[in-house]
Amino acid sequence: GELWCLPEGSEQAKLHAKLAARAERLQNFAPRYSDALRKRVRHLERHFARPRLVRALRGVVLSTGGFIFNREMISQHAPKFRRNFKVGASGGDGSGLRLGLSAGAMADRLSRVSAWRFINPPLCWPKGIVVNTLGQRFVNEEVYGATLGQPLCEEQGGKAWLVLDARLRKQSIKQALFAGYWWFQSLPALALMLLRVRKGQSIEQLAQVTGMRGDELRNALQAYNAAARGDAPDAFGKSAESRQVLDQGPFYACDISVSNPVLPLGALTLGGLKVDEDNGAVLDEHGQAIAGLYAAGRTAIGIPSHLYVSGLSLADCVFSGRRAGQAVAVATAHVEVEICEQPL
């Protein structure tokens, strides 16, 4: 692997920093524009960067994030998540991962991606039902966003509907308007219910306008309503507090698919380089530590590398970073780092 840098203080380096910062700042509001800025950043890197030699005598820690911003790697390892909104920093392009692989490292769980489909607020949304394109319910609607987003992308092709009846829709709109939510919570919710929605006077008509199967949608609603009335257990274990009978037409299907720009379905990669759990040393294909090479954060396999749970990513990065840093710190008593420009 090689390290390339823009000449310090150059006009290209200043422009690079400006464009990269703007891409980070606008990612959540204008992702396509941010992607265009990143292309300009990569152009500067390709045409003006120069190779540098860095000699580290204790060790090297790879901690550059995952690879959600690398379309080629996503297409290769996690193609079901190509359309998701990218969550993370621009540096999450797989550079650390690829550098480790070039040194003989082994990677694992590269197909594991966490996708987040939150359907609250409004807090009453989970009282509706989430169904697939056939009209079949497939999840407990009150679960954490990553627990809902995972099967939506992995098993349902990234397509699903949130079904409400007239009463629940009215309650949801009222909450979105007057419950004191942040604008970035209330506006997408209102847009989803008012713009990205299909309406049917009956269940059969709703199925027709959405392309769902009428018998499947009716069966899903009948089973759910029975559980909401207390006549039967909920098929997916939803709590009694989150159940509400849906029987007042017209009925509405809100598009919560990955392709809906009104309600982005974010995702980040979880896999990384295999490491020794005692010190963060990167392992080769034989399970042996590669001398002087360590990894941390999403560049490495960690606690949330199979299934993300809120907070684990930050905590795991802090833990794994300290672990690797401590291992490198005690590797030798003295250290020198030599950095010099390499001729082209």
Predicted regions and their residues:
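A glycine-rich dinucleotide-binding beta-alpha-beta segment and adjacent secondary-structure elements
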Residues: 216-303, 307
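An anion/pyrophosphate-binding glycine-rich loop and adjacent beta-alpha core
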Residues: 97, 106-212, 216
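Active-site-proximal substrate-binding core of FAD-dependent oxidoreductases
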Residues: 107-124, 326-344
